[in-house]
């Protein structure tokens, strides 16, 4: 049985409050209505679109955790970060990110998402990419969502922090990279358990 508009909107607010990352498509499926109906409901309730909700959550949650660059300079939207350990961002590939003829994403967008996430995960005032080894695994098309996952995996003998970034569309790996990061505080901290790498 379909819910009344008032009941659906109440449940919509509750659902978005519990999970601000839910998409309009997922909401439409959950409430058995069209995506357009969900968008109209959101407009009536003054609930911003997913991208704006993600930015709002990121600003509230991560502003004090990301030191190496302003959040608005990160390519993609950070949805989770543990400084000097791991981070996750999402990047929705739109028409402006792809080649017109093939609708395949330009590689520099995937690299920029991964590289800026590698910088953001470094908990220091200054973090720069000293070296990057990257691999494009498969093409990404317009309309796909890329989820990049960064993990600090160790340090080089010269003291650079090593960050591995893997990017996925769904469960499929589309990009991988290993970034050696220079940081302004390159001395090994006491109790740092990261292993050294070559």
Swiss-Prot record:
Family annotation (Gene3D superfamilies): Hotdog Thioesterase, Winged helix-like DNA-binding domain superfamily/Winged helix DNA-binding domain
Xref: InterPro entries: DeoR_HTH, HotDog_dom_sf, Transcription_factor_FapR, WH-like_DNA-bd_sf, WH_DNA-bd_sf
Keywords noted in UniProt: DNA-binding, Fatty acid biosynthesis, Fatty acid metabolism, Lipid biosynthesis, Lipid metabolism, Repressor, Transcription, Transcription regulation
Pfam families in UniProt: HTH_DeoR (PF08220)
Segments forming domain MaoC-like: 102-168
UniProt record, GO biological process: fatty acid biosynthetic process; negative regulation of DNA-templated transcription; negative regulation of fatty acid biosynthetic process
An example Gene Ontology molecular-function term: DNA binding
Matches recorded under CDD domains: hot_dog
HAMAP family given in the database record: Transcrip_fact_FapR
Family per similarity comment: Belongs to the FapR family.
General function of this protein: Transcriptional factor involved in regulation of membrane lipid biosynthesis by repressing genes involved in fatty acid and phospholipid metabolism.
The name this protein goes by in its record: Transcription factor FapR
Gene name of the encoded protein: fapR
């Amino acid at each position: 049985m379909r819910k009344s508009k008032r009941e659906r909107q109440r449940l919509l607010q509750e659902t978005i409050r519990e999970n601000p990352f839910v998409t309009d498509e997922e909401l439409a499926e959950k409430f058995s209505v069209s995506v357009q109906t969900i968008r109209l409901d959101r407009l009536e309730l003054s609930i911003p679109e997913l991208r704006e909700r993600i930015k709002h959550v990121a600003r509230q949650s991560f502003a004090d955790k990301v030191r190496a660059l302003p959040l608005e300079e990160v390519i993609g939207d950070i949805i989770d970060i543990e400084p000097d350990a791991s981070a996750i961002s999402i990047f929705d590939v739109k028409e402006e990110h792809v080649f017109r003829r093939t609708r395949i994403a330009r590689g520099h967008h995937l690299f920029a998402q991964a590289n800026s996430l590698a910088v953001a995960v470094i908990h220091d005032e200054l973090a720069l990419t000293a070296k990057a080894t990257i691999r494009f695994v498969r093409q990404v098309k317009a309309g796909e969502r890329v989820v990049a996952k960064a993990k600090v995996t160790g340090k080089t003998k010269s003291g650079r922090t090593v960050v591995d970034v893997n990017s996925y569309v769904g469960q499929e790996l589309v990009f991988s990279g290993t970034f050696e990061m220079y940081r302004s505080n390159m001395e090994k901290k006491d109790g740092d358990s990261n292993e050294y790498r070559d």
